[in-house]
Every structure is written in C-alpha cells, then in structure tokens.
C-alpha cells in the first residue's frame, strides 16, 4: 500500500516536453524499473516467513525481530514523498540509480548481520532505497511512454502486488533449503544488474526546482511512529511495565510529536500533509477507516506466517504459502469489484469487505474444526483476501473523490494511514507475543481483537462519502 504514493505521482512528470513522444528503447527501460519495483515489493513480505529462523540465529525476541518488518514500512512512508520531489528537482535517473546502489549495499550488509539491532538499522537503509525506487521509477515510466503513459503506468502498478505473492514463498524456500540470510543476499546480483543496465539505458529527465520539501513535517511524523514503536517494543521485552518510564517516556514523546505534526501541517506554507486532508469533510472518517483496515488486514499479512509456525508448527515454506491464498482471494475479486463500483457505490463494498475480512480473522484465530491446520488457515486467509479485494477499490475511490485534482497527495495520505495502522498492529502484537508463555495463542487473541475492531467500525462506513456512476 505504501507504493500507492509513488505510483500516483506518475502524472507529474508526464506533462514535460520530454514526455511528448515515446522514447526509443522504452520497453527495455520498463523491464529495468519493473524489476526494481518487484524487488522492493518482495522485500516488504519476504521477511515475515523468515522471522522464527532469524530470531533463533540472532537470539532475538519477537518484539525486536518484528522491527525488521515495521522499520521497512516506516522508512517507505517517510522516503516516498521526499524521493518523488527530489527526483523532480534533480532528475529521476539519478535518484533511481542512487536508490539501487543503497538498496543493494544494504541488502549485502543485511545478509552478514550478526546482531538484531544492526539488522534493524540496515533494514532502515534498505527502506530508503526501496522507497525511492517507487516514485522515481513511476516517473520514468510516465516520461518514456508519452501519450501511452496511462496504460504503461497502469501495467507498472500491477507489478507491485505480485511481490506480495512471491515474497513469503521465496522466503520459505530460502529458509528451508539454505538460510534466512539468502532473503537479503539474493538482492545483490539483481541490484548490480539494475545499476549497470539503468546507467546505460534510462534516459535523463528534465528538472523542476520549483517544489519545496517539508523536512520538518516528515521528521515529526517519523518521530511520532518511531517513538511509539520503541516504547511498545521495550514493553514487550518483559523488563518493564506500562508504568515504567522506559515505556512512558517514548509514548509521551510520540504524543507530543503527533501534536506538533498536526500543528505544523496547519501552519506550514507547503506541509507534508495538508491539514484539510487530515480532518476535512469526509477525510476524517476515511483516514480512520484506512488506519483500522491497515491494522487488521495489513498487520494480519505480516503476522500470519509467524503465527502458523508458532501455534501449529507448520513448516516455513507452508507458512509462507498462506499469504499466497490471501493474494489469490484479492486478485480474484478486486477486478470484479472495480467493474461494479459504478453500480454499487462505495459503502456496500466497504461494508461487505470489512465483514468478510473480520470473518477470516475470526476463522484464523479459531481451532481447525476437524481439518488440517494448513487447510483451515489457507481457507481463512483466502476469505480475508476476498474481503480486502472487495473493499479496497471502493475505499481507494472514496478517498480520491474527495480531492480528485490532488490524486497523488490523497493516494499518499491513504497509504500513510494504512501503513501506520500496520506498523502499530505489528508492534503491539509482537510485544504481546513476546511477553506470553504461549505466543501462538497470544497472537490468536490479537486476531480476535482485530476482527472485533473491524466489526465495531462498520457503523462508521455509513459516514463514507457515497457516489454511483462516473466522476
């Protein structure tokens, strides 16, 4: 979902004179940047399957090992808007190649990390590279395809979900037949090829130095999420209680940073997020729903492989394929949901989708009724995927229609709230599991809470801006 921000920015570079006609060799360039996007998207999910092996080798608790997932998402939230604007100012090719070098170097170092804290820092570096790939690559595609940029960008956007299917399975293969270190080292030869081919084939782009970067806003948002994550992780270590200053100080710092972030957005001339997009007409309810959806649906995706291994003892490769069932459910229904949007409007698909996702979460948490654990969880994951496929297009359009002339900013806002929800859910769940004598059952109880949150949010859907037909 974080990728939406970069993908939505495609139209900005498309208006330059350089984009007036298709560029020779554009299909080679398309293949290069598509491979980069696929690599970055795979790294969003590949670590989830490898968490137990990673924890064992690095002697880490789940509350800290889960940071290898959440820090990657956090880094992308913060980097993508920066990378998009810097690419416009200094050239997308430079940003793309710099991102490829950073991502490849960080991947190599991740593969040889012998400490969980060092691995977390290196994953943050990976996130900077991966987050910069998306807006720069999308701008390159929009530039080189000229009048056909709409179809090219649409096809390019469809590549990102493929990583969600490949990642967990690929992670399971590496852990089963080699080592968790392989999930990072596999990026190195690919990254070297990207840098070499990109330097030769990607054309330079025009520069636009008229945009300002809201560094203060991005730092305040980063401080909010990072402080909250740190306090929750420390609580999960079992060395503190909710009354311990080691927990309270970071959480209070997060609250202060959040207040300052909102205040900054209200006063800055060119804020990272317009205050109108935070609480303006229709935005408040959509932001809340996107946050809750990210907590339940995206947090679920990050945690299911670990849950399957800890509660049922499933093999790593089998646990990874559970997310393939979720992705299959999404793919099977999302296209139909998009086709029917003009007839159904937005509220009904979101209502049905949230309900189905909640049912899937309830099933995941329940004990298998006389069937294999793998079969039951695959079915439940598929139901969650169907729910996500039904609701996501409607939620996307309902948010975009609030400000169709600022689609890039709105898509980025939507991705920010969903990823923030995911980060919050994974951090809290990991802390609870780390303090529990039975981590598998603890995660099952968290899935029940996720389901309850989605069901309690159903009345809010009545406040979603409704629309049928074209817009």
Task: Describe each PLM feature range.
Residues 162-196, 213-251:
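Helix-loop-helix hairpin linking two adjacent transmembrane segments in secondary transporters
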Residues 139-140, 144, 173, 201, ...:
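A residue-level signal for alpha-helical anchor/packing sites in multi-pass solute transporters
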Residues 87-94, 148-152, 207-213, 271-274, ...:
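Interfacial helix-loop-helix linkers and transmembrane-helix boundary segments
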Residues 25-42, 47-51, 62-71, 82, ...:
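12-transmembrane solute porter fold
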Residues 188-207, 222-234, 253-268, 457-465:
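C-terminal membrane-cytosol helix-exit motif in multi-pass small-molecule transporters
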Residues 78, 132, 193, 223-226, ...:
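Residue-level signal for the membrane-embedded core of alpha-helical transmembrane segments
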Residues 27, 149, 202-219, 239-243, ...:
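Short loop segments and helix-boundary regions at transmembrane helix junctions
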Residues 2-200, 336, 343-344, 352-355, ...:
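Transmembrane-helix bundle of Major Facilitator Superfamily
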């Amino acid at each position: 979902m974080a990728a939406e921000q970069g993908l939505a920015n495609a139209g900005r570079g498309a208006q330059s004179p350089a984009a007036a006609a298709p560029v020779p060799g554009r299909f080679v360039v398309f293949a290069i940047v598509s491979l980069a996007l696929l690599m970055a998207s795979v790294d969003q999910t590949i670590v989830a399957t490898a968490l137990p092996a990673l924890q064992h080798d690095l002697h880490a608790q789940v509350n800290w090992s889960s940071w290898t997932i959440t820090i990657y998402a956090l880094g992308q939230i913060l980097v993508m808007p920066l990378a998009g604007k810097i690419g416009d100012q200094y050239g997308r090719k430079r940003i793309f190649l710099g991102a490829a070098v950073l991502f490849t170097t960080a991947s190599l170092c991740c593969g040889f990390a012998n400490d969980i804290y060092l691995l977390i820092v290196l994953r943050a570096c990976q996130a900077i590279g991966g987050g910069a790939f998306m807006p720069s690559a999308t701008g390159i595609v929009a530039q080189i395809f000229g009048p056909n940029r709409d179809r090219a960008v649409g096809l390019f956007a469809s590549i990102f979900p493929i990583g969600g299917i490949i990642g967990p399975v690929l992670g399971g293969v590496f852990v089963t037949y080699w080592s968790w270190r392989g999930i990072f080292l596999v990026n190195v030869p690919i990254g070297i090829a990207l840098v070499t081919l990109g330097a030769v084939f990607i054309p330079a782009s025009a520069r636009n130095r008229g945009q300002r970067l809201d560094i203060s806003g991005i730092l305040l948002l980063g401080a909010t999420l990072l402080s909250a994550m740190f306090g929750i992780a420390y609580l999960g270590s079992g060395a503190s209680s909710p009354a311990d200053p080691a927990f309270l100080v970071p959480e209070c710092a997060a609250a202060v940073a959040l207040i300052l972030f909102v205040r900054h957005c209200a006063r800055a001339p060119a804020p990272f997020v317009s205050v109108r997009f935070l609480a303006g007409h229709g935005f408040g309810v959509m932001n809340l729903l996107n946050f809750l959806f990210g907590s339940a649906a995206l947090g679920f995706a990050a945690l299911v492989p670990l849950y399957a291994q800890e509660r049922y003892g499933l093999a790593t490769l089998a646990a990874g394929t559970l997310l393939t069932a979720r992705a299959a459910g999404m793919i099977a229904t999302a296209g139909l949901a998009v086709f029917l949007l003009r007839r159904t409007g937005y509220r009904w698909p979101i209502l049905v989708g949230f309900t189905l996702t909640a049912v899937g979460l309830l099933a995941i948490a329940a004990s298998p009724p006389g069937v294999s654990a793998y079969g039951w969880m695959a079915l439940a994951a598929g139901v969650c995927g169907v729910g996500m496929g039904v609701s996501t297009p409607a939620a996307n359009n309902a948010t975009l229609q609030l400000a169709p002339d600022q689609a890039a900013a709105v898509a980025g806002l939507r991705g920010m709230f969903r990823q923030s929800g995911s980060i919050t859910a994974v951090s809290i769940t990991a802390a609870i599991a780390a303090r529990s004598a039975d981590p598998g059952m603890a995660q099952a109880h968290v899935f029940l809470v996720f389901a309850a949150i989605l069901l309690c949010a159903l009345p809010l859907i009545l406040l979603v801006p409704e629309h049928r037909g074209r817009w």
